[in-house]
Amino acid sequence: YIRDLIARIREGIPGIAIRTTFIIGFPGETEKRFETLLDFIRDTKFERLGVFAYSKEDGTRAGGMRGQIPVETKDARFAEAMAAQRKIARAKGKALIGKKLNVLAEKMATDKDLQGADVRSWEHGLIRDTNRRSAKLVDGQYTIARGEADAPDIDGRVYVQGELPVGDFSWVRVIGHTDYDLIAEPV
């Protein structure tokens, strides 16, 4: 039912960004259920996806459940789910190259912001793909912006070459991408 609903939503609202969050390793999660979730992630191709490993809390109902998943298994499943989403995010980023986006300029990028753009992001906790040409920022001044579907401190950023008016929406053209961020130029 949910796959059909998502397909109808996407058909009815072109360009919509669908986001969700999953907990990996909840007590009783079997390998088969996890594989079903992975298939759902791969088939649905969410625009934004968060994954968290279940953390046992003493005194909670779930904390007392049988079938607690070993940390190593949760970590492996987390990594596998995020790898699947990273592949989806890269494909979605690549598909946006050459397209125009309306972005909200947040601030001028500092050297520290730019260093983090092609190496590591605390937002995602994942190493960026720095081997691709599109994953690197060329020297120069950048504005950090957000797309219309991007939540601050959670989603990727749009690094726009040059200066945009901070606090305003501006149109940009996507010219590259990292795993989760876009690189753009003003239109």
Q: How would you describe each model-predicted region?
A:
Residues Y1-T60, F78-K92:
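Conserved C-terminal portion of the radical SAM core fold
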Residues G64-V187:
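Terminal RNA-binding accessory module
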